[in-house]
Amino acid sequence: MNNARYTNSISVLLFFLPCLLFSAPNIGGISGSIQKTITNSAGDPASSPVFTVVSAGVTGDAIFSGQLASVTSTTISFESSSDSSETTVNPFTSGVFSSSVKTPILTASLTGSGVGSIAITYAGTGFSTAPEIVIDYPTSGDDQATATASINGSGAITGISITSAGSGYSVAPTVSVVGGPHLVKLTESGDDDEGRFFLITDNNATRLTLDISKLANGETLQNVLQTDFSVEVIAAPTLGSVFGTTSAELDLSPANANGSGAGADWVYLYFGDYYSFCFMPAGNGNAAGWYSTSIMGWGMLNDLIVYPDEAFIMAKRTNGSLTLDFEGAASTTDKKVQLPAIGGAFVMNNPYGTDMLLAE
């Protein structure tokens, strides 16, 4: 089962006003979980799907935290540091957050209580520098396995070398890379924009290039992310990270074959219009993964962003029941939400987890 986290209390909103931001007042801290079961018992479930609206929370620790050294209209930069040998240490590996990167799928196998090998289930593409390999901690103890990657001219991973097998593993650990879709989150305490997210589209060793399309009219990046402000870099929720990248991780029903959405449960995302996606098995020269149900030319979409301040629609199009665990903590700080322009729409999640009134 995939260990994704979901939050609910969602609103689907259609707006007839100019694009703007609104802020909700602080409330006390609230946390908890809700388990939701979706059942479809129709004679023809694909023609009579059962819908629900949910959102993906940001999970996992920040891969970097620091203060901004400088800000331009589209970039933010950080200072380098030095280790005990006075060797310069840069915060990032160049190119790993590029929008052209597709993250690999890596699978570990054990030899005894250590990691013996890591298979490349899907090699990914687009890396200009070999990414850092991250292997989960062992079941017992803290002797964590380590490994390095090599890439080819297309930026695909061609090999994984185990540098330390570690010990204390009773089950094969999850293996990931530091790369692919990541977000910058403003963590400057007390600032009106605390909690705002920006997608990273490219990077070098000290600089991040950001997508500024979510800035409201009249806003600039320099106004929101100011010099010396504190930020975090975190992995962005994606179709693959939320729902799984292999059939073993998947809770939803996959398609019968690659190239068709038949037999699958669907996920709808909204970006200008609704588009549906499902997990498809390998076939037709394509690896197993997430694809559009109608536009196969988009290719594998495991890395398609599911923004943490937006929600999505799930369609149970197969018979049976699907149980989802909705977990999360309510925010205790003001949140600004960008409302669409006149006639626009988006599926909005409630950052507080309680009733929220949209008012003047």
Model-derived features: positions:
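Conserved, function-critical positions that sit in or immediately flank catalytic
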Residues: 70, 100-180, 191
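A short, polar beta-strand/turn micro-motif
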Residues: 23-88, 92-100, 188-203, 207-264, ...
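Signal that preferentially marks extracellular ectodomain short beta-strand elements
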Residues: 120-121, 160-166, 214-221, 291-301
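Well-ordered beta-strand positions in beta-sheet-rich domains
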Residues: 107, 132, 146-148, 174, ...
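Short, exposed beta-strand/loop patches in secreted or surface proteins that constitute
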Residues: 60-71, 106-111, 147-153, 197-203, ...
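A cross-kingdom feature marking solvent-exposed beta-strand/loop segments within repeated
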Residues: 199, 273-308
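Sec-dependent, cleavable N-terminal signal peptides
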Residues: 1-25
